[in-house]
Swiss-Prot record:
Organism: Eremothecium gossypii (strain ATCC 10895 / CBS 109.51 / FGSC 9923 / NRRL Y-1056) (Yeast)
Residues glycosylated per entry: N353, N789, N911, N1243, N1346
Annotated localization: Golgi apparatus, trans-Golgi network membrane; Prevacuolar compartment membrane
Membrane topology listed for this record: Multi-pass membrane protein
Protein's GO biological process: Golgi to endosome transport; Golgi to vacuole transport; protein targeting to vacuole
Lineage: Eukaryota, Fungi, Dikarya, Ascomycota, Saccharomycotina
Stated name of the protein: Vacuolar protein sorting/targeting protein 10
BNR repeat positions: 164-172, 372-381, 452-461, 497-507, 717-726, 812-822, 1095-1105, 1137-1146
Transmembrane feature ranges: 1349-1369, 1405-1425
SMART domains: VPS10 (SM00602)
Disulfide bonding pattern of the chain: none
Membrane topology (Lumenal): 21-1348, 1426-1508
């Protein structure tokens, strides 16, 4: 008995000691540090086993549990990668060798078999490779290799992929066909998830991109490439990409193959056969969007980065959209949010039966919060701090639910599976990082804290006082963390923390030496792993690998029922139609869960169905609990409006919902008649409770963004041409003004009433706020730098507490985008960064500013090159200055009410504009307008009358230096604001339209009640003018009462620039070459606007047609392939449009209710197929908008082949030329024009693809009158009577760069003209050196002799000639009677004095001279007689014509070189009308005298001729 007791005592002691040892020892993982990391691979774990695998060098290593690593395979080549098959992680892995051989194992690494060897062809590099298995068939494998060509080719693609497939698990493998050269192909098994709806597990989907043709083909094969089946859904679509997302196949198509920023459309399919386009509330552009699915796999979540390069921004904002359970109909997450939340991050699916997370910010200046949704995004709530946690450490005023947290879920967490996607699960354990709020307690050493949640993110506790990277294993029962910075925990060495009790306590393992972790790898990616591999880099750049292996932790004990506890999701409330209970391991349990996710699968108890379990059906909008309303447009797009009327179910149960006892849903009748047969035009209407004040598109091709300022001081932004709008949060302050940067199309500035400036550099997607200087806002325009978007000048009022004499403007400059301002210049009211604008500035940093001098009541112009730290005065008294093109024009005050014009092209040299003698200026020039500048010429309108409703002026044009002006036309219409009826159609060089005052004489004398206006057009930059040619019939086919042959009495007249409601509206479009629209009438002069019709030209103004009998507003779309008209000033509910260049027109009803459309707008370049109608209800103070899209009205995109022949796909080369001559400005230019009307153009750069078919010889049409010369009735240029020509060398004084000058001819070449050869009216052939430039002149003309040499040789020649001449005179003329007998000498006279042989020789010379002189005079008399006879005969030949005759010289009689006539003694142009061109052909200048009396006798009336 005593022995037995001793035995028991001994046993109990040993057991107690063992227990004490077991309790005292904490379980620790195996942590190995590998310092020889050359070609050391990451750890992988075979699922459901404790077997680990990796590679090093040429070996593959395996480890079982706590055993050591052992070699299972050694190759002749080094191993590049080893990866476990994600679909069959229990047994299969693949290994790639350095020689591109592929091996596989099917038994957890015990044995290995060769699959294939990938070889690159000559001239190719193998970049990467991958192997894919099929989740539903173990034997199916696909190997993909990515190649790049060493030498790029214009025909072959730079990179491409090849695919091989195996049907027997890799025993044999064959290529999946080969794409054509130049084609890039991507292929996937369509089965990407088990239980997929794809009919066959062998189905492969491929997309082939042809980069040269900008096309892609999508097809499927069910027999491994033996046959291909094209997808019919995309026959007329431009496919851009294909992707697989859970149960869905996603295909994106683009509206424009030539525009990388074009609108994208997404199509979804579950079976790879039937695809349906998603219904999306806005536009998707680019391909930078995130797509995830919810836990059921039915809902798709799109998170689209907002704005330019947002996908790479650190704190990018996102627009989030969630689909219904069909994956087709999307709604914006923002629609389900509290209005407090303005800015959103991407949505993440937390895989907890519908749990989603999203970061939000209440405003751009407030702290972020993270929101949770448990119902697929229909409602959201913030994350908050757990009870009992120190809220003050986070900056919260209260704890618990009052402390909302901005939790950024750890990147390691989301990528590893702590939260994860697919099969990943962690029993509700999440880790993240929190940014401390403003005013948090304690040291600010660390701005971030690491937090942990154990209830799927509802409540959070602090885990670390600094940010850590975190990782999870065994479904959250193993947690690892390492500090972002090794020294954050007070220890400079790196360490790894791990927790085995779900983050309640942490153990630390030090890593000797100073290392920083750069990569962490989990052996299994679904959250079940028990092995991890850390890569760390030391200070000396040496690397180590730290393996943390938990496979034998807790002695390998697996959890039993006693180690588990129940957790009810959402506190036991219904979620997705059921109540979910999850088995979680107790945090203190010393065990690991089985390596099987089924151990944590929830228990599901269905709930009775409610509205929350239903969603609106396809084509219905709203929420089930508030009612689902039919949207006819969406129903039509979804194909649900084929029959009429029809009954449809407004809502249905969410797919995958677990609820029972379905609701009784009554069908609704839908009348589809309104949309069944209408064209495929989309309309989106909005009603605003305020009126639009200003609106403008951003000048960018990346999207259709615009901003609106409303009357109640709100700023609205739309990125889809008005389809959706959002409001900018100005924190309660009103938006006072919106300004756009004229040089950078993505930038805009919003002035708020609290002196805050909101700036966007990405078209309104993001804004940042800056404080303006503490001065009064004067609403003066910002001045922008043309090259630096961060530099601009703001003008504020100092001493302006009260508006009085002390109040003055001050300029403040910023060079960092407004974040800091520096006071630059007091008194400045206007500045320009001229150094950034000029082509050749004297200093690129030059700024010019206008300074207001209140005391002397004048303004001063200053300039500076150091931001006005120093400056110098340019002019003492100016009216203003303006930079256009490459010129700055300054209006200088010259005494009381007198203005002069000065121009500069470099900011240093200023030249006064010189006007010709025929320019009759008013006694005091009070104003002028700078109209245009191009190709080195500037147009001015010099005002001659500022009398109200009687304003007009003279149109003048400068030479290439902007100095010497010539008159183009007098009596050009203007208004009191300085606007002028002057327009140059975009894209048409030299074409100008103006309105002239027909009754100018009566207006000048004060006898006219109103101005009578006529529209004139010039095709050669203002040299010649014609009245517009009227159409023969009106829009109803009736002839006009007047005939266009007499254009003085019958021409087309258009309302011009002075009457525009919006000055941005123009006749033309820069993208629709040759197209113009205008409102006017056919008759003697212009009628009032309401009595006019709408006219169209497609040939640059040569011919016109009436398209509507009433005034309409218009816009061009898609480079002119769409023309949209809307009635102006009357109620309407329809638009009229044409898609065939105006040949036919269709009406489209955009609304049921009639409204007055105030404006129709589109993007600045008229390249979009979307338009916005704006209506203002002035009495009710509302605005309505109608976003109209023609994006789907065409069947296809036009084919365009750059560099093709005359017929280029759907385009044809056509020329826009002078109506009377083939050449325009010395060349024949042909543009590509669409000739097939069933396609749209898009962003194909065909407008740039023009060609010059011929350079023409110079003709009279390529010249205009030079300075001081005037145009006469016969078209020649002459000096006015009494005007002396300036010295020819004066041109050298005006242009100091000139080396030579020529004798003036009265003509100068039009700067736009590119002609070569032919006439040279602008100069003689003999240049002369400019004073002081003789050296440069003779270097330029080496054949010329220098001045001293010329003098010497002339003196020598003179001496040689004078001696014999004196002898001849003395002995042959003087003593024979002198010159008095010269005309009497008879050739047979014998009374000449001859004393010797010398006398006889001299007399013979005298006789020969007499013959020569007599012959010369006789020839001249004969020539004069014959020329006079020819002129008389020419006048007789034209006398039968009606009207005055021409005065013309027939040049081929006596001109060997036409230029010889240009050097006349009277310095005029010698009455020239015709000269020889290169081909020796004659041409007539069709110049006719202006005026009603003369014009009544002519078919064509040329304007601009003034009879002498």
């Amino acid at each position: 008995m005593v022995g037995m007791l001793f035995v028991w005592q001994t046993f109990l002691f040993v057991w107690a000691c063992a227990a004490a040892v077991e309790v005292g020892e904490k379980p620790r993982p195996v942590i190995d540090i590998v310092r020889d990391v050359d070609n050391l691979g990451s750890i992988w774990q075979f699922k459901g086993t404790n077997t680990l695998i990796r590679h090093q060098g040429r070996e593959i290593l395996v480890r079982h549990g706590g055993d050591q690593w052992s070699t299972v395979k050694k190759f002749d080549q080094g191993v590049n990668t080893v990866e476990v098959d994600p679909y069959y992680p229990e047994r299969r892995a693949f290994a790639w060798l350095e020689n591109n051989e592929l091996y596989k194992t099917d038994d957890c690494g015990k044995t290995w078999a060769r699959v294939m060897h990938v070889e690159a062809e000559p001239g190719e590099n193998l970049q990467r490779y991958s192997v894919y298995s099929n989740p539903d068939n173990y034997k199916y494998l696909m190997v993909t290799s990515h190649f790049e060509r060493k030498d790029s080719s214009p025909v072959l693609a730079e990179s491409y992929e090849k695919q091989w497939v195996s049907q027997d698990g890799g025993k044999t493998i064959a290529p999946l066909g080969h794409p054509d050269p130049g084609v890039y192909r991507l292929c996937h098994f369509l089965r990407q998830a088990r239980n997929h709806d794809v009919a066959k597990d062998s189905t492969i989907l491929c997309i082939e991109h042809d980069a040269q043709k900008h096309t892609a083909v999508l097809y499927r094969t069910d027999d491994f490439g033996k046959s291909k089946q094209a997808l019919d859904s995309f026959d007329d679509e431009i496919v851009s990409s294909v992707g697989l997302l859970g149960k869905y196949i996603l295909v994106t198509t683009t509206e424009d193959a030539y525009n990388k920023h074009a609108v994208q459309h997404v199509w979804v399919s579950r079976d790879g056969d039937k695809f349906q386009k998603i219904i999306f509330p806005t536009h998707i552009r680019d391909n930078f969007f995130r797509a995830v699915t919810t836990s059921t796999g039915n809902q798709i979540i799109f998170s689209i980065p907002a704005g330019k390069h947002s996908h790479s921004r650190k704190n990018a904002l996102y627009a989030n959209y969630i689909s219904d359970s069909s994956g087709i109909q999307f709604h914006a997450v923002a629609d389900s949010l509290d209005e407090r939340y303005k800015e959103l991050g991407p949505v993440m699916a937390l895989d907890a039966n519908g749990t989603l997370s999203m970061v939000a910010r209440k405003s751009s200046t407030e702290d972020q919060v993270t929101l949770l949704s448990y119902d697929y995004g229909y409602s959201w709530q913030p994350m908050h701090l757990a009870e009992g946690e120190d809220h003050k450490a986070l900056g919260c005023s209260k704890g618990g639910k009052e402390c909302e947290l901005p939790v950024q879920l750890s990147q390691l967490v989301s990528s590893s599976g702590l939260v994860g996607h697919g099969e990943s699960a962690t029993s509700g354990i999440l880790m993240g990082i929190v940014l401390k709020k403003r005013g948090s307690r304690g040291p600010r050493k660390h701005k971030y804290l690491s937090v942990i949640s154990r209830d799927y993110g509802l409540t959070w506790s602090v885990a670390f006082e600094y940010p850590v990277l975190s990782f999870a294993g065994n479904y959250g029962n193993i947690l690892l963390a390492c500090p972002y910075n090794p020294g954050d925990d007070g220890d400079p060495e790196e360490e790894i923390y791990y927790s085995l009790d779900q983050g309640h306590t942490w153990e630390e393992h030090h890593i000797e030496g100073k290392y920083e972790f750069v990569r962490v790898h989990s052996a299994i990616s679904d959250g079940s792993s028990t092995a991890f591999s850390f890569l760390a880099v030391g200070d000396d750049q040496n690397t180590i690998v730290v393996d943390c292996i938990f496979t034998d932790i807790h002695n390998g004990k697996e959890c039993t029922d006693g180690d588990m506890e129940e957790y009810k999701l959402r506190n036991g409330n219904c979620l997705n139609g059921a109540r979910y209970t999850i088995n979680k391991r107790k945090s203190e349990a010393a065990c690991l869960l089985k390596n099987d996710p089924s151990v944590i699968n929830p228990l599901v108890k269905p709930c009775d169905c409610t509205n929350a379990d239903y969603e609106c059906s396809l084509g219905f909008l709203g929420l089930p609990d508030k009612g689902c309303t039919a949207d006819l447009g969406m129903l039509r797009s979804a194909g649900a409006c084929k029959d009429n009327p029809r009954e449809l179910m407004p809502m249905h149960k969410i797919k995958g919902n677990e609820c029972t006892k379905d609701l009784n849903i009554e069908p609704v009748k839908v009348d589809c008649s309104a949309v069944q047969n209408r064209p495929d035009i989309e309309v989106t209407a909005h009603v605003f409770k305020t009126q639009f004040e200003t609106y403008q598109y951003f000048n960018s091709a990346e999207d259709d963004s615009l901003m609106v300022l409303t009357k109640d001081k709100r700023a609205l932004i739309s990125h889809d041409s008005g389809k959706t709008f959002k409001m900018l949060d100005t924190l309660g302050s009103g938006a006072e003004l919106i300004t756009f940067n004229r040089y950078f199309g993505d930038l805009a500035y919003i002035f708020a009433s609290d002196d805050v400036l909101y700036i966007t550099d990405d078209r309104g997607y993001h804004f940042y706020a800056v404080d303006l200087p503490e001065v009064r806002h004067l609403f003066l325009p910002l001045a922008f730098h043309a090259k630096d978007n961060q530099t601009f000048i703001y003008f504020g009022g100092k001493d302006c507490e009260k508006l009085g004499p002390k109040c003055h403007s001050t300029a403040y400059i910023t060079t960092d985008g407004g974040r800091n301002f520096r006071e630059m210049l007091t008194g400045a009211v206007s500045c320009e960064f001229v150094g950034s604008i000029y082509s050749h500035p004297a200093n690129k940093d030059m700024i010019m500013c206008e300074i207001e001098n209140k005391k002397e009541r004048r303004n001063i112009l200053l300039r500076s090159t150091d931001e006005f730290r120093t400056s110098d005065k340019v002019f003492d008294s100016i009216i203003g200055f303006h930079t256009t093109g490459d010129f700055t024009a300054i209006a200088v005050s010259e005494g009381r009410q007198q203005v002069s014009s000065y121009l500069t092209i470099d900011g240093v040299h200023f030249n006064e504009s010189r006007f010709p003698p025929d320019f009759v200026a008013p006694e005091k020039q009070q104003s002028y307008s700078v109209l245009s500048a191009h190709e080195g010429a500037i147009f001015l309108h010099m005002s001659k009358s500022l009398v109200k409703h009687k304003e007009y002026g003279t149109l003048v044009k400068s030479d290439s230096n902007g100095i010497d002006f010539v008159v183009l036309k007098d009596g050009v219409n203007s208004n009191a604001e300085g606007l002028v009826d002057f327009e140059t159609p975009e894209g048409l060089d030299g074409v100008i339209l103006i309105n002239v005052v027909e009754n100018l004489d009566q207006v000048q004398k004060g006898k006219a009640k109103a101005k009578h206006l006529k529209t004139a057009i010039s095709f050669n930059d203002g040299v010649d003018w014609k009245y517009l040619s009227p159409p023969g019939k009106d829009s109803s086919g009736k002839k006009y009462p007047c005939h266009g042959k007499n254009r003085a009495k019958c021409s087309l007249n258009l309302h011009g620039y002075t009457e525009r409601k919006d000055l941005r509206d123009t006749y033309s479009s820069g993208s629709a070459i040759g197209y113009m629209l205008g409102v006017g009438n056919v008759g003697e002069h212009l009628l009032p606007y309401e009595q006019c019709s709408t006219f169209l030209t497609t040939d640059g103004g040569v011919t016109w047609t009436e398209v509507k009998s009433t005034p309409h507003q218009w816009e061009f779309g898609d480079r002119g392939s769409i023309i949209v008209l809307v009635p102006d000033g009357v109620k309407t509910n329809s638009i009229t449009y044409s898609v065939d260049a105006g040949r036919s027109w269709q009406d489209f009803k955009f609304a049921d209710e009639e409204v007055i459309i105030d404006d129709i707008i589109t993007v600045p370049y008229d390249t979009s197929m979307r338009f916005l109608l704006i209506s203002k209800e002035h009495l009710r103070g509302k605005s309505k908008t109608y976003a109209i899209s023609f994006a789907h009205i065409f069947k296809r995109q036009c084919e365009f082949h750059p560099g093709g022949g005359r017929h280029n796909g759907d385009f044809e080369y056509t020329s826009i030329k002078h109506p009377d001559y083939k050449c325009l400005f010395g060349k024949e230019v042909e543009f590509l024009k669409r000739i097939k009307y069933d396609c749209f153009i898009g962003n194909a750069s065909y407008t740039k693809d023009y060609r010059t078919s011929r350079i023409c010889p110079c003709t009279r049409q390529d010249f205009e009158c030079d300075y001081n010369y005037i145009r006469t009735s016969d078209g020649t240029c002459k000096l006015p009577s009494g005007v002396k020509p300036e010295a020819p060398s004066a041109v050298c004084e005006r242009n100091r760069d000139l080396v030579e000058y020529f004798q003036p001819t009265g003509y100068r070449k039009i700067p736009l003209s590119k002609c070569e050869g032919g006439l040279k009216l602008q100069r003689t052939d003999s240049p002369h050196p400019c004073p002081g430039k003789e050296k440069e002149f003779y270097e330029k003309y080496p054949s010329s002799t220098n001045a001293s040499s010329v003098v010497f040789w002339w003196l020598l020649l003179t001496m040689v000639l004078l001696v014999p001449l004196w002898v001849i005179y003395d002995r042959g003329i003087r003593r024979n009677g002198g010159f008095s007998r010269f005309g009497e000498i008879r050739l047979d006279d014998d009374d000449l004095i001859e004393e010797n042989g010398l006398d006889r020789a001299i007399n013979k010379v005298v006789k020969v001279g007499a013959y020569g002189v007599a012959g010369l005079f006789g020839f001249l008399l004969l020539l004069k007689s014959k020329a006079g006879a020819r002129i008389r005969r020419f006048r007789e030949s034209v006398s039968s014509r009606r009207g005055p005759s021409y005065s013309s010289l027939i040049s081929d009689q006596f001109l060997d070189d036409a230029n010889d006539l240009l050097v006349g003694h009277d310095n005029d142009a010698n009455n020239l009308n015709a000269f020889l061109d290169e081909d020796g052909q004659h041409f007539d200048v069709d110049d006719e005298i202006e005026g009603a009396d003369q014009a009544s006798y002519h078919d064509d009336v040329d304007l601009g001729r003034t009879s002498e």
